[in-house]
Amino acid sequence: MHKALALVAFTALAFPLILIGQTSNVALPQDKGPNKIDVSTYPAAQQQGYKVFTEKCAKCHTIARPINTSMTKEEWERYVKRMMHKPNSGISDSQGKTIFEFVAYDQANRKDKNPSAFFKSLSDEEIEKLKAAQH
C-alpha cells in the first residue's frame, strides 16, 4: 500500500515535468497531446524547419512529445545535440541546427505564451524511475 501511494505521489509530481528524447517504448504524458501544429504563420525558414523536425524526430519518438514539451533555449540545444548522437538518428549537423532553430522559435512564439499548457522536462533520474514504474 505504501509503495502504491509513493508511486501515485511520484507520478502526480512528475506529470508536469517531462523530458523528450527517451526511447519510444516509454509512454510519456505528452505523447497523448496534439501530434502536429499549424506553422502556416511561421517564417518560411521555420516552416522548412518543421518539416525536418517532423521527419527526423519521428524516427525515435512521437512528434507529440517535443510539440507538448516546454524547455529553455539552452535545454533545447542540449537535447537536440543529445538526439543527434543517438544511434541511427540520421541527424546531420546542419539538420540538427535547423531542428534547434525550429524548436527554439516554436518555444518562444507558441509555448512561452501559454506555459501552463505544456510539460517541463524531467531529470534522467526521474525518467528512469518513470520507466521502472511502467514495467
What is each stretch, according to the model?
Residues 42-58, 77:
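Sequence/structural segment immediately N-terminal to covalent heme-attachment motifs in c-type
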Residues 65-69, 89, 106-113:
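Inter-heme linker and motif-flanking segments adjacent to c-type heme-binding CXXCH motifs
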Residues 1-6:
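Positively charged n-region of N-terminal signal peptides that target proteins for export
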Residues 19-25:
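Signal peptide processing junction and immediate N-terminal pro/mature segment
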Residues 68-80, 85-91, 96-99:
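Amphipathic, hydrophobic secondary-structure cores in small proteins
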Residues 8-18:
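Bacterial N-terminal signal peptides
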Residues 54-64, 99, 103:
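The canonical Cys-X-X-Cys-His
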Residues 25-44, 94-135:
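Flexible coil segments in periplasmic/lumen-exposed cytochrome c-class electron-transfer proteins
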